[in-house]
């Protein structure tokens, strides 16, 4: 059965509390999950989905999948098409599972879907076999509604009788067809006609409730949505959501309100007389929550039951509500968890029934016609089990039953709930719309504790079905694509007792002696006293006395007191972190004695940790071997404290040695008794005395008050003052006068620059060279310059008085008194009485005009404007202006307020200012003049606006910019000021307190009040919006909306607004007339990649109509946003060739939104700037190409979006002239004659070749028939071996390399430890540069320029091209979609270059001469890994195994690598070798006591060859890298208990003849059949040691020759096992001597003709391996093989090559065939076939390599389109497969045809696939390392790259050169 899901028993990493703990998940990719059911006994999980039902094991392993759809159907067909021919067109329709119930009595699953009007299937629980699917009667159709969560059902078992199904469902307006609630029979026979029939039905009553059609005619949208159903006692309950008909208006377009209700019926009531429904809800902090989302029935824990005052076996209902009553489909995220007791609900219902039967009120069921029918007084006794009568029913509740709020949430959106009781606690689990699981402990209605939140599925909502496993140890969560199994507790995540017991998880307790958080049942010793803690106060408490020790005091005995510990008589050890453990002494009192660490351990513990090191003293239980408790312990180190105050102020007993300037814990260490200080009062210290102020350049001493200053002793240096400023240090000798005073000697100090008037410096007093005296924290030393930043007298005198700066009049400079000549008369200081600065100057005044009434605040700026505001006198234009002290800035700025001018028409004038008296030196006036004006206004525009205000008014007049303050008043309200100039004031009109009316306007400019009689502003009725058309847009917005309303002309700047997920957007509107305006819809920010197809609804949608609040959010709006349209480019290259006037088809998606109504998107298509007429469909636009020719750009405009699709190449057909036609005819005739002559000559030549070919072919046929029997026997034997291998493979699997190793071996052949495999360790600036370089690589223009520039360099070698290609692909692996676009562009450029250079098109991609070709190889490497593992890897591995086993059946020369059996002539032994097969019994190296392993070897095998065969057999199925190597093992021949002989290739028994030394073989040692051997670790013999130097030297000489770039495998892969030692004159040989030796030359080996006997061996080997070669070729050249589909990458790349050929008008099929062959088989498959070690963890020897090369060559020949002419010079491998290649060629051609016929892959689908591939392997390589390697080429070709970036227009536009230069600069800064 085809799998429809991707089953991931994923170890999905969960964030949050789960950390990295895994949980299981079942994930689907091609369907949507809807419902979940868990078997209450077996724990099996059943999942309902769209078109599927799954059965899963409890661990979520898929057991069965049952297909339920799609089905041919039409929603309008009733009865469904399965019963009667339907008049409506049928189409495949998805079957959405809406109900999934387990019928335990009948051992079956009830699965109800949406097709055929809602039929159900009965599925056998064991295997989901369909037992029945009733669909013949109307009772079988439950409802055709499509919503998956609108139905709920309950099965009620009835003992001996059939079970009943109570089912509630939404009916989607079809109440005449479906009851909304019914009770139906569940017959044991699924084919029974009574299945699903109503439990009771006669002509008057039945077991059903229907929504009256009159209700639907009034409220077409009315429906009842069933959320949850359950049984309690003898009642059946349903929680529902239904339209609130009392709040919802009859207008269908109006806003809809919903209410939640609980429905109750008696389970045994077949007439539904007991139907009662009550509104329910919850309130919290005054906010109502009325939209029920989910519910769960449970028992309360004992603590909750006690808090509620109900029995512990009472049923309670945990319920989730969303806030408000709107947006049922997309409810608000503000949600609440509430609790109802069933007893309370039943009490409300009982009281309601009793009141109705007393005749009080009406039936009050709003959606029934008889809702206003009065209750009939019927005296009778009504108790809690009353099930109704024929009267007073159905009944509705009058008041809302309020739940108890437990937990509110406003972010995640709670969506589902489940609960159960654990011990005394109620534990509630909540799924959220953000994809997380919340865990809540509820111990009371005011005691709900959210103790854990676990992310499960990022961004995907958890659906309603939240279920427990039968043992309540796991919980199953359902989302649209995933079922997740999470443990109900994750106690082990808590690492301490406090974290464990403080988490709030009731499942968790602390297992004391095992120091772990777990359930009590998982704790060994939990039953012992204090063995298991469940309360925080019961955690182990540890107290240590003393709790600190000096680092100089080792081995102190510590007393440890323990509380809350179990019996410790088994013993306890103490340990200080890494220090050694010491056994503790257990005292009778229960206390422990532990020694502190030794001196050596203390040094290790405290080194580098400063003054204190807090270490954990840990106690280890000898009973459990676990460290179960501990306490912090402090080791203090006084010696690191460098000052007296820090030393004696330490909390530890530290003492300061004054004369040694050291801190110690040992007071006796001080040299002098009087030098010891043990309290802060005795410390030498500079006393606080204010800031130390030092003028620059003044030679002066500095005296400081101090205390306890030590007197330097003999040999100690005196005091010094050390000053550090601006990085410079100045040391000044100082004198200690006594213990309380010190003076720095005469010195001057300075700092550079005048940017600052003062600067703080680092000042300290030291003695004896470097012993600083402590300073108080508040001590500051300031160095200052009087003249810096104080250029005027006023600024000088307002300097800090402490600086004692004054103004030197003669010098015009701010200086100290001592620096000013004649200071008594020439130096001014603020302390001097009457000091004032002369020559004030005004530089600016503002404003320059004002009303004569005064009140204008004039700001005057200048210098020397007085030192106090009271000493400044001002007149402005002759009028007094009063200074405002609060705004005065000494000497710099004065703000004054004008008095009224009493002159009728006052003239303008300057500002006059006096400082003190008005003598000439202290008086000034401004150059600017101030003028008096009379402001007036005479017009307001607009003259009318809405009563809510918000209109932008422009009041026009003259001199309106006068004064400093302006107030506009409309009637009695202030108009909000915006701006003004001389001719106009702009303000925003206020709200009219009188509503629509006329209002006067007045102005107040400072103290001038201005009015304009007769000028009136009219407040009108507020505008309203009554209708929108259309009520939808696209995500981008900017589509036209026609708005109907009233009074729209009064709106000045209307805008339309939308608010979505908290983000508000707006767009413009244009008013057309008073009742209509045209708007452009605002776009919304989606926040996720794809919008829903059914559209997105904004949280708010409305209009900004000035300040009209009622239009901001239209309550009745159902505005919808649909996905934006998107278009495909015109072609891969963006150019499409068409004829003039032909149709142009533009393909796209979402071109017609799925919106109701006739409105459509308005598309404009511009071709060459000219619009064309359009025809629009769902997926394409059709327009006519214009009449112009040439290249015309194509652009599509829609809704503010612009799509540039490419270029149309419009080419007209031109008729040929008569001379041209005659010339063509003549030329054609000549050409025909030339072709005829060539063909005649060619025919003669080919006839000779054909005769030679036929002769050779005949020889081959004869030889092949002669060896057919041998081939058959050899194949049968090999097939037996391979069958054994494949059987073993089923157990151990093929040794595939991991993705990372595989990719590195292909991308960087021969480099196993490439830098990209490890993270780069680099300085921060280089790392930053590389990250910027990585960003630059995401610029297509840069990468293309970069690569093309490198390729243009003559020194850029082939190896460099491959390296750059590989590094680029690694660097871009996280963006494979982008890398693919780059690759396509590079390939397109390569094709263009190939054609321009007149090269034959078939040469394209043949060799790796460009970066693009290697990138293509790497691209396939990345994307075909999965195909290799799942499909092609197996036949390739079997071929490798077959070759290896077949080769090893015959002799193989260890020196030359030649073999008896070979596909390669070059590796064929040309002599007769006598050999016998031996079976050795090998002792397993790792377990000599296990069974011996029989191994077949040849007696002519060298010892190393024998070891390899033994290792292959003993470690069968083990990857090569994980098993021992032959060179690391010795072969030991055991001839008895005592006789053991080490066999070696060379030893003292080795035979030497002349100068030839023969390798030892098994025959040399006379090893017999059945011998016992063993592989033992290598032993170095004297002989080996003597020869190791010679052998190593010889090996190193051959290594460079034998290692090739095609294989990253070790030297053993390519080289013979033993290398001849020619330097010593002795030549090694094994089976045959080297062919180059004169005495043994067999003839001319250069000849390609093979003698008959050797060709026979080649043919025999070829025939034996034929099936394995065929299997591999068939797999590779099949579009669907072994259940695997064709990889997307192959189809996508082949289509790209076809498109390139189409664009370049290459119609030759051979060229296209060759391109594809060069692209995939040549570039990828040949590489993999020749080097299987790229894919598998194997060892490839030289003979296997040679045979694989023959297979790879055959593979290449099969892909070629040219005919292979065989002759006497043809290679043997071409002769070998001459008969097979035509067949293989047909496979290749069929393969290419099949791919071409397949549906194209869209760029979007390919991008999605590539993004997923990037995600899967995002962390496999170090991108930073790849960028670092790639940057080498930037460095090497720096200038060329920068020049190329300058030349490229696109690079210049994006300033790519500057960006690269920035990177180069960053890197260079580190060098």
UniProtKB/Swiss-Prot annotation:
<dbReference type="InterPro" id="IPR013548">
    <property type="entry name" value="Plexin_cytoplasmic_RasGAP_dom"/>
</dbReference>
<comment type="function">
    <text>Coreceptor for SEMA3A and SEMA3F. Necessary for signaling by class 3 semaphorins and subsequent remodeling of the cytoskeleton. Plays a role in axon guidance in the developing nervous system. Regulates the migration of sympathetic neurons, but not of neural crest precursors. Required for normal dendrite spine morphology in pyramidal neurons. May play a role in regulating semaphorin-mediated programmed cell death in the developing nervous system. Class 3 semaphorins bind to a complex composed of a neuropilin and a plexin.</text>
</comment>
<dbReference type="GO" id="GO:0021860">
    <property type="term" value="P:pyramidal neuron development"/>
</dbReference>
<comment type="subunit">
    <text>Interacts with CBFA2T3/MTG16.</text>
</comment>
<keyword id="KW-0677">Repeat</keyword>
<dbReference type="InterPro" id="IPR008936">
    <property type="entry name" value="Rho_GTPase_activation_prot"/>
</dbReference>
<feature type="glycosylation site" description="N-linked (GlcNAc...) asparagine">
    <location>
        <position position="738"/>
    </location>
</feature>
<keyword id="KW-1015">Disulfide bond</keyword>
<dbReference type="InterPro" id="IPR013783">
    <property type="entry name" value="Ig-like_fold"/>
</dbReference>
<dbReference type="GO" id="GO:0021628">
    <property type="term" value="P:olfactory nerve formation"/>
</dbReference>
<keyword id="KW-1133">Transmembrane helix</keyword>
<feature type="glycosylation site" description="N-linked (GlcNAc...) asparagine">
    <location>
        <position position="746"/>
    </location>
</feature>
<feature type="disulfide bond">
    <location>
        <begin position="497"/>
        <end position="539"/>
    </location>
</feature>
<feature type="domain" description="IPT/TIG 3">
    <location>
        <begin position="1023"/>
        <end position="1122"/>
    </location>
</feature>
<feature type="disulfide bond">
    <location>
        <begin position="282"/>
        <end position="338"/>
    </location>
</feature>
<dbReference type="InterPro" id="IPR036352">
    <property type="entry name" value="Semap_dom_sf"/>
</dbReference>
<dbReference type="GO" id="GO:0017154">
    <property type="term" value="F:semaphorin receptor activity"/>
</dbReference>
<dbReference type="GO" id="GO:0097485">
    <property type="term" value="P:neuron projection guidance"/>
</dbReference>
<feature type="disulfide bond">
    <location>
        <begin position="77"/>
        <end position="86"/>
    </location>
</feature>
<feature type="disulfide bond">
    <location>
        <begin position="500"/>
        <end position="517"/>
    </location>
</feature>
<dbReference type="GO" id="GO:0071526">
    <property type="term" value="P:semaphorin-plexin signaling pathway"/>
</dbReference>
<dbReference type="Pfam" id="PF01437">
    <property type="entry name" value="PSI"/>
</dbReference>
<dbReference type="Pfam" id="PF18020">
    <property type="entry name" value="TIG_2"/>
</dbReference>
<feature type="modified residue" description="Phosphoserine">
    <location>
        <position position="1596"/>
    </location>
</feature>
<keyword id="KW-1003">Cell membrane</keyword>
<keyword id="KW-0675">Receptor</keyword>
<dbReference type="GO" id="GO:0021612">
    <property type="term" value="P:facial nerve structural organization"/>
</dbReference>
<keyword id="KW-0472">Membrane</keyword>
<feature type="glycosylation site" description="N-linked (GlcNAc...) asparagine">
    <location>
        <position position="548"/>
    </location>
</feature>
<dbReference type="GO" id="GO:0048846">
    <property type="term" value="P:axon extension involved in axon guidance"/>
</dbReference>
<dbReference type="GO" id="GO:0021637">
    <property type="term" value="P:trigeminal nerve structural organization"/>
</dbReference>
<feature type="glycosylation site" description="N-linked (GlcNAc...) asparagine">
    <location>
        <position position="59"/>
    </location>
</feature>
<keyword id="KW-0732">Signal</keyword>
<feature type="domain" description="Sema">
    <location>
        <begin position="20"/>
        <end position="488"/>
    </location>
</feature>
<dbReference type="InterPro" id="IPR031148">
    <property type="entry name" value="Plexin"/>
</dbReference>
<dbReference type="InterPro" id="IPR015943">
    <property type="entry name" value="WD40/YVTN_repeat-like_dom_sf"/>
</dbReference>
<dbReference type="InterPro" id="IPR014756">
    <property type="entry name" value="Ig_E-set"/>
</dbReference>
<feature type="signal peptide">
    <location>
        <begin position="1"/>
        <end position="19"/>
    </location>
</feature>
<dbReference type="GO" id="GO:0021766">
    <property type="term" value="P:hippocampus development"/>
</dbReference>
<dbReference type="GO" id="GO:0008045">
    <property type="term" value="P:motor neuron axon guidance"/>
</dbReference>
<dbReference type="Pfam" id="PF17960">
    <property type="entry name" value="TIG_plexin"/>
</dbReference>
<keyword id="KW-0812">Transmembrane</keyword>
